[in-house]
């Protein structure tokens, strides 16, 4: 672990962040393609996990942004994975982890992250607001995740601009796309709305986009395939190549 002063210097010298928020509001199916080796609900998903090899294929297939799991115990991820992906990609990269301390926000930027996940359920209101403000000061607009109306109210009160609705209940891992549909009406139009987890077909994206969602986070459905670019192109339909 870097000393605090060294970490902050590294974060401030990393260069400008890529525009994560802007990448999610283009007039198309904006998919955040997630790179992960394992998950608490499925165990190891991809034994031959090489994020640096997978990221360019997902970008070429049309991903709007990439999400990289850096949590070690449950997802077998690392900050090294994020650094490797950032070096081989041109689109924004999000750090996905259980972020509960401002130190991790500095750490994310120093590793090259352009955004990071804030899970409303695991932080109090004070920490949520503090890390939102810190992220913005470092040019990173965070993805603030919610699963209920109460959590959405907290996220909006803290000033979240990118709201992710997790269709997976973290208490029992049950997945319901209706969670997104139930909450979309309460997400202001000037916020970026992201539907996360449980998306399995192009029709799911059509349905959710029609309801008002701007972007979609998809991981396991991609990672379980030998070539994840194939299902990503199927999700995107006619939009199968990233615009140069």
Task: Report residues per predicted region.
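Short acidic, glycine/proline-enriched helix-loop-strand junctions
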Residues: 90-91, 139-140, 190-191, 235-237
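Catalytic cores of alpha/beta
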Residues: 100-111, 147-159, 195, 199-218, ...
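An N-cap/entry alpha-helix motif that binds or orients negatively charged groups
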Residues: 1-48
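Glycine-rich phosphate-binding active-site loops on the catalytic face of alpha/beta enzymes
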Residues: 110-127, 165-173, 211-232
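C-terminal helical cap(s) of enzyme catalytic domains, especially alpha/beta-barrels
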Residues: 182-186, 209, 222-244
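Active-site-adjacent beta-strand anchor residues
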Residues: 75, 145, 194, 198, ...
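Catalytic-face loop-and-helix region of soluble metabolic enzyme cores
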Residues: 162-218
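N-terminal active-site wall of soluble small-molecule enzyme domains
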Residues: 30, 35, 42-143, 149-154, ...
